[in-house]
Each structure stands twice: as structure tokens, then as C-alpha cells.
Curated annotation (Swiss-Prot):
Pathway: Metabolic intermediate biosynthesis; chorismate biosynthesis; chorismate from D-erythrose 4-phosphate and phosphoenolpyruvate: step 6/7. GO terms for biological process: amino acid biosynthetic process; aromatic amino acid family biosynthetic process; chorismate biosynthetic process. 3-phosphoshikimate binds at residues 23-24, 28, 170-172, 198, 317, 344. Keywords: Amino-acid biosynthesis, Aromatic amino acid biosynthesis, Cytoplasm, Transferase. CDD domains: EPSP_synthase (cd01556). It comes from Neisseria meningitidis serogroup C / serotype 2a (strain ATCC 700532 / DSM 15464 / FAM18). Disulfide bonds: none annotated. Phosphoenolpyruvate binds at residues 23, 95, 123, 172, 348, 391, 416. GO terms for molecular function: 3-phosphoshikimate 1-carboxyvinyltransferase activity. Its EC number is 2.5.1.19. This is 3-phosphoshikimate 1-carboxyvinyltransferase.
Length: 433
């Protein structure tokens, strides 16, 4: 029997939410710290399934990690060489662990088996494996061609220093390559083949690599140059920003409910691209206040939420939240250039279309777009399937602010990035039923 939670019709209270640490920053930071030549104390690390999978993997690879407090730990770097050259690594459905670890282990070489949950074995990795093979890596598919699970063997340096890679499926492939190639000590040039999607996630990678002492030359997101003799040296202390993707639910709530909501842990100088979500809300009726360590959204009650037609390539995760905001506009809304949704935790375009229809919305799906026309009145007590996708569960919680109760199946899927989400959400609302 699937566990579910019923969210009654609710009113949002003026609120401040302290965000959990960013998933994207947490897992990148853990790996970079593990590969550094010194120790790094990491503060405000996200505690979630995805970071747990990365920590378990690093432990199996022989990395010494001291747990100092619930959200603070010290990683003792390995100097760019994992002590354990043989390991069996289960990585769940954590793309931010699977892709970068694949690249790092392939570049270092050894005898490694990488696998995950069934959905991870449906998420493509062929473009990354192809690029690593050009660099001399031994990457073998143990199941379906171009998909996990993988076996990684010893790398032979073949002298190849120019690595082409496709960027139109997942920016994590480029992130993985960027983080791994400095471990060789050689100069490399990475050349993009076709379009690079989700560029803001590459910005996160490059900014974090710079904090760990490796400066990559970025030539207009077409060519990336890694210097020779690079090595990772960690800052003694590193503070993880709040998760900007997780912020989107609370910021959207402030817009939908015309009630001020402030999120702390991100701000005007955040390195995460998903902070741009607040700027998109501003275009459709929100008042946004930016601080150094907060973003606040509200809306005057007399101002309507506007419809939108948005190219969401720059905010693929936060854009899911806009699919729910569309229900508050009363008019057809469109999200474009979201093809990457198809290969995330689930096929998010199909899943979003299915569940919005349960609420009475008219939805037209395209390969890389979704068109949403809200109904005059939403269907109450719709039972929303979440497809083991944390973002589906968090998005659809907002329906309870639109005047109808909603039932969310498998609410614990939020443990991937935000285990306390439903507790936090209910603390911000008052039941009006």
C-alpha cells in the first residue's frame, strides 16, 4: 500500500524558511574535498539520500570523513588518489554522485562497479562514457549499451588531449569531465558538440573548482581549457549555500497566496542558476526583495498572477514549480526548451502532464515543451502520483494553496533532497477547511 499525505485547503502565513543545503553544491564539494591534498571542514551540508550515497561511496573508496555535527563534517583529502582501487558502489538515483564519480574513477583507473536503482539504469550516460574513452578510460556497460550499471578499469594515457562531448542531454556529463580531468596533471581541452543545456550548473562547477584551486578557461561555453599541473587544494572551511531549487516552492507559494515568504541561505550573490526563478516570478506579478542571504517574494492581492510563455532552459529544476503556478493564472501557459526533463528522476514532462490532468487542467505535451491550460475550478482531492521524484511531490503540495485539498502519494520521495519538506510546508500554513 502506497503511503500518502492529504493536504487540506490551506492559507499561507507570512513566513521565513531556512533552506537545506544545495544538493548540487553539496555533492560537488564532497568530491572535490575528497580529491584535495588537505582537509576541508564543510558547513551546512545537505542531509539527504543523494548526499548519503556520495558519502557512502567516498567511505568505500577509503576517504576519511569526520562527522562533527548534523550538518558539519571534515573531509580528509586523498591528494587526488583514492586509497581503495577496488570498490562496488551503489549510488541510488543520485545523478550528482553517479556522473562525477564515474569520471573521477575512470580517469584514476582501478576496478570499480557502479550501479543504482532501476531508474538510474534508465538514465543515459553514453555521452560521458564516450568522452572518457577518448581520454583513454576503460568504461564498460554491464547492461544496456549507453546506460548504467558500469564497470571501470585501468586507464591508458593515449596522449589525446582534446575531448569532444555532447551537452544536450545533461550538463552533468560536462561537470563530471571538468572535475575529473585535472586529476591527470595534464592540460586538456574539452570541446562542446552541439548545444550545451543548463549552463548555470556549469557555472556552479567552475566556481567551486576555482575555490579548490583549479581555474578553468571558459571560452563562451564552447571550449573549456584545463591547465597542466592542476591539483585540488581545499579551503579550510566551506559553507554550502541553501538549495535554490528547493527555494522555488516557497517563493512560488508567496506569489500564489499573495503572502510574503522569505527564504534564507541564498541571496543576490548566489552561485546557483535557480535563483533566477525569483526573477521569473517578478515578471508575472511578484514583488521580490533581494538580500545578501535572503530572497523574499510577495504579491499585492489586487494584482493578478500573469500567464507566461518561457524558455526555461536556464532553470530546468525550478521550472517544474512554474507548471503549478500556471494553475493560478487562469490562462494557457507554456514552458519551452525543457527536453532535459525527460531524463531526470522520471520523465518529468509526461509525469507533469498526467498529474495536472487529474486536477482538470488541459495539457499538451511536446518533445521539449508543455502547454498548460488551467480549468475554471480545480478537481478537489486529486490523488497525485510522484514517480519516486522528489520534485513532483514538492511541486504538487502547492495545489493546497489554490483552494482545493490534494493527496500526494509517496511523500517520502522528498528524502532525495529535502527530507523535512512536508513538515516545513505544514508549519507555514493554516488549514481553512
Amino acid at each position: 500500500m502506497t503511503e500518502s499525505v492529504r493536504l487540506p485547503v490551506a492559507r499561507l502565513k507570512p513566513s521565513t524558511v531556512a533552506l537545506p543545503g544545495s544538493k548540487s553544491i553539496s555533492n560537488r564539494t564532497l568530491l572535490l574535498a575528497a580529491l584535495s591534498d588537505n582537509a576541508c571542514e564543510i558547513h551546512s551540508l545537505l542531509k539527504s539520500d543523494d548526499t548519503d550515497r556520495m558519502l557512502e561511496a567516498l567511505d568505500k573508496l577509503g576517504v576519511q570523513i569526520e562527522y562533527l555535527a548534523e550538518d558539519r563534517l571534515k573531509v580528509h583529502g586523498t591528494g587526488g588518489r583514492f586509497p581503495n582501487r577496488t570498490a562496488d558502489l551503489f549510488l541510488g538515483n543520485a545523478g550528482t554522485a553517479f556522473r562525477p564519480l564515474t569520471a573521477a574513477l575512470a580517469v584514476l583507473g582501478g576496478d570499480y562497479h557502479l550501479h543504482g536503482v532501476p531508474r538510474m539504469h534508465e538514465r543515459p550516460i553514453g555521452d560521458l562514457a564516450d568522452a572518457l574513452r577518448i581520454a583513454g578510460a576503460d568504461v564498460e556497460y554491464l547492461g544496456k549499451e549507453h546506460y548504467p550499471p558500469l564497470h571501470i578499469g585501468k586507464r591508458q594515457d593515449n596522449g589525446e588531449r582534446v575531448i569532444p562531448i555532447k551537452g544536450n542531454v545533461s550538463s552533468q556529463f560536462l561537470t563530471a569531465l571538468l572535475m575529473a580531468l585535472p586529476l591527470t596533471g595534464q592540460a586538456f581541452e574539452i570541446r562542446m558538440v552541439g548545444e550545451l543545456i543548463s549552463k548555470p550548473y556549469i557555472d556552479i562547477t567552475l566556481k567551486l573548482m576555482a575555490q579548490f584551486g583549479v581555474q578553468v578557461a571558459n571560452e563562451n561555453y564552447r571550449v573549456f581549457k584545463i591547465p597542466a599541473d592542476a591539483h585540488y587544494h581545499a579551503p579550510e572551511h566551506l559553507h554550502v549555500e541553501g538549495d535554490a531549487s528547493s527555494a522555488s516552492y516557497f517563493l512560488a507559494a508567496g506569489l500564489i497566496a499573495a503572502t510574503p515568504v522569505r527564504v534564507t541561505g541564498i541571496g543576490a550573490n548566489s552561485i546557483q542558476g535557480d535563483v533566477a526563478f525569483a526573477r521569473e516570478l517578478e515578471k508575472i506579478g511578484a514583488d521580490v526583495v533581494w538580500g545578501e542571504n535572503f530572497v523574499e517574494v510577495s504579491r499585492p492581492k489586487e494584482r493578478a498572477v500573469q500567464s507566461f510563455d518561457l524558455d526555461a532552459n536556464h532553470i530546468p529544476d525550478a521550472a517544474m514549480t512554474l507548471a503549478i503556478v500556471a494553475l493560478a493564472t487562469g490562462q494557457t501557459c507554456t514552458l519551452r526548451n525543457i527536453g532535459s526533463w525527460r531524463v531526470k528522476e522520471t520523465d518529468r514532462i509526461a509525469a507533469m502532464a498526467n498529474e495536472l490532468r487529474k486536477l482538470g487542467a488541459k495539457v499538451v505535451e511536446e518533445a521539449e515543451a508543455i502547454h498548460i491550460t488551467p480549468p475554471k475550478t480545480l478537481t478537489p482531492d486529486a490523488v497525485i502520483d510522484t514517480y519516486d521524484d522528489h520534485r513532483m511531490a514538492m511541486c504538487f503540495s502547492l495545489v493546497s494553496l489554490l483552494g482545493v485539498p490534494v493527496v500526494i502519494n509517496d511523500p517520502k520521495c522528498t528524502h532525495k533532497t529535502f527530507p523535512t519538506y512536508f513538515d516545513v510546508f505544514s508549519s507555514l500554513t493554516e488549514t481553512t477547511e
